[in-house]
Amino acid sequence: IHPGYGFLAENADFAQAVIDAGLIWIGPPPAAMRLLGDKLTARHAAQAAGVPTVPGSDVAVDDLDQARVAAQRIGYPVLIKASAGGGGKGMRVVRSQSELEAALRTAQSEAQSSFGSGIVYFEKYLENVRHVEIQIMADSQGTAVHLGERECSIQRRHQKLIEESPSPVVDADLRARMGSVAVAAALAAQYASAGTVEFLLDKDRNFYFLEVNTRLQVEHPVTEWVTGIDIVLEQFRVAEGKPLSITQDDIRLRGHAIECRIAAEDPFNNFAPSLGTIVSLAEPGGPGVRVDSSLYRGGKVSIYYDPMIAKLIVWAPTREHALMRMRRALEEYGIRGIQTNIPFHLGVLANTAFREGRMDTGFVEVFMSTGWLTHKDAHVEELERTAAYLGALVVDQKRLAGGALGGQPQPLNGKAASHEGSAWRVAGRRQAMR
């Protein structure tokens, strides 16, 4: 059983049940999932291994009194984080004590409903930092490698929206340092299969451990494209008890890959969920373009699933080329019947700071306050052009039906038209005289 990248993929009890049933679990060992999948225990493991972590609480925060003490010690702003799960669920930023009680209650409730555990802890909320993660791969023979980094700073409410590899600011030396820390964490936990070690990176190139995702990531295709390594295939090899087919020396990053998560959300209405039926669908294609989607004409988008409905991934030799290719692919992506966040992605790609690689985890908040909504989406402009064209055709057809051309062109001077007479020319002259 391969669990994909949903919440079951991180559920150690489910993994153990699969194994106990005599089936092959294509994923990390349940023991490693329990150690690293829980953010608090992963934090302890990282600290024991000497990995720098974000300042925070080392125990769960259960009630308001504990929350006040922890927040006072760490210093505002603080980030309340669910110990289980991921995907931005059970997380709240608190900037003052007056916000603490409501945020704690909401985070605990959301964590409980999402992951079956309401355990939360506190971290210092670091601002003006990047979110950079390292893809790791390990086998059961004690070999682990890293496949480079992904830049994941473009996110909203702690949910990633755009990912790319390599990061615009990570050079070979920093990649090696972050990669070695990620590999050490995997080996210390006797990890096997695919996983992701997430870090915060500050402007001085200091990095801090965040958490480990003990599963395949949504954004794994960007790493596959720049490394040429099929991560899922390696997962199958590891699940069969085979060693990795690659070594660290085999891994080279080539070109640049970008992924945009396409969601059924209306960016013009505060990203409200958009429900409905897919009326028409036109997916982009061509060299270096990949679409992961289950959309089809007539398909329903309901409230019962995550709003992400597709992933659009591109690869090109350079980041600049990849940005151009992604923009073209987004402009060609036609989804009718529901609203999507494609206009948002187009706006980000047109942003100068983003194009220059200047971003942090607060990018989207700033971007949304800059009036980007005043710029028309390419889809809107396309519809306007099409409507204008069709309108002109309708008007011309009415004129034809009304006898403006009437079979033979009618002479303007009452005389018969010459053999050089043109119905289009006559119609044009009549239009000019109206």
Q: How does the language model describe each region?
A:
Residues 2-197, 201-217:
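N-terminal beta-alpha lobe that positions the nucleotide/phosphoryl donor
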Residues 182, 221-434:
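Catalytic cores of soluble metabolic enzymes centered on carboxylation/carboxyl-transfer
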